[in-house]
């Protein structure tokens, strides 16, 4: 095998595919990067759950394939001078790497035992701007469950309907939903749950521009095509929460607050709350103001924030981090807070109608003081 390509392109491919190379496996071959050179150069990392293949424009003079040591090969390419890199692999899997005056010789492995990637099939793809898909993921993934007792909730559920693509995450204490309204009908009606770990890799590859990404749904896997990268991820199976039944509607109390001001107040009173010293933030919603306070064995904190509306002196306790996470995910300057009573969830939505997002946080029971 022999190919020549630009260092910058090769390094980009190694950085992306290296994230799904298995760290430790009984199948040692997947601890390396599959390098296949034919019409183009394709690099693949696969940990048996998620696979990423990255295609690079290269001058291939001798087609072939091998398994390259991921860390060593990546470190070498990273330190080479800018410009073209030539890689030659002989029949004994000795690898020669040359760029400028620098040259290296390392060992590779046969690709004969590298596992086949899952066959997703050739179903109809759904396209979405990269920035929109990135927004769906970043706006929900923080709310996935870390409890392996309910594996289905360790992923994000996607619901594709005629003109919308929604992402929903729940962890038993909060819920996050974002919906993207497509310009053209998707022509599909389906739902599936993608593991958070796989989505984190998708998010890292996505850009903030409006170039399209696409995905194809298979029986047990999903394939994302993002520019030169192809990611295949195993889907989660099980019964996801019927989220529409748990999100309150027609809440009698609706308040409006400045996102930045309310977030800052919550973060301030949350300074004395930690994993060791847990305590809810007590929110007293009054007329035109919400008073925030919390106390732990290490101290106490109070603050207040202006709001529009009358909270009817309703006092509710919330997990500090969950409330702050929801506020940080609100893209508008103002947030609408919807409340019912001290034992019902709070629903947060952007004040601007152009954002179809919603966040729900369950209350924490507080003692009268």
Task: Describe each PLM feature range.
Residues 1-369:
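Structural preference for solvent-exposed beta-strand-turn elements
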